[in-house]
């Protein structure tokens, strides 16, 4: 979506899991504006975490309109298009599937699933629903990662 050639419409983002990685992601989204002539702008609009003291940090982000302890409330919002999830590993499958089924695109943390079967279930749901999923790896060029390719 683009409002004009000089002012692209923002991609509105929600974060589930506001700990260290959630704060890092929020900071990265804020720095996105430094990218000159980049066709996409990010706008963080909603954050979910079960700890009130973690959510409090996000009050300083002027674009955030929703702070909640319930990820389903975040996912029900029409103003959230993409969701970054940074929760404990054992919650990945459940929350990733909830994100996809809510019609949102997913920025996922590794591991994608706690095992191969979980990863396949998430992948299959994303394909079935036609959702975009990105799992980031900060070390793709380490020897072990290269051997797996």
How would you describe each model-predicted region?
Residues 35-40, 102, 127-131:
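Short helix-capping segments at alpha-helix termini
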Residues 12, 43, 79-82, 105, ...:
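Structural signature of beta-strand start/N-cap positions in the alpha/beta core
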Residues 12, 54-55, 92, 110, ...:
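Short, cationic motifs built from Arg/Lys/His that form the positively charged side of catalytic pockets
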Residues 113-149:
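A contiguous active-site-proximal alpha/beta segment in oxidoreductase catalytic domains
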Residues 1-62:
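N-terminal Rossmann-like dinucleotide-binding module
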Residues 17, 88, 111, 137-140:
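Structured beta->alpha junctions
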């Amino acid at each position: 979506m683009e409002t004009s050639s000089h002012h692209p419409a923002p991609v509105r983002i929600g974060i589930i899991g506001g700990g260290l990685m959630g704060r890092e992601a929020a900071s990265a989204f804020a720095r996105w504006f430094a990218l000159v002539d980049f066709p996409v702008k990010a706008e963080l609009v909603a954050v979910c975490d079960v700890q009130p003291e973690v959510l409090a940090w996000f009050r300083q982000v002027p674009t955030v309109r929703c702070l909640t302890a319930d990820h389903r409330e975040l996912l029900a919002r029409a103003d959230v298009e993409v969701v970054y999830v940074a929760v404990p590993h054992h919650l990945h499958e459940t929350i990733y599937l909830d994100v996809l089924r809510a019609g949102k695109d997913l920025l996922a943390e590794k591991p994608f699933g706690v095992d191969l079967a979980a990863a396949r279930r998430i992948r299959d749901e994303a394909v079935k629903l036609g959702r975009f999923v990105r799992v980031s790896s900060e070390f793709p060029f380490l020897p072990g990662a290269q051997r797996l390719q």
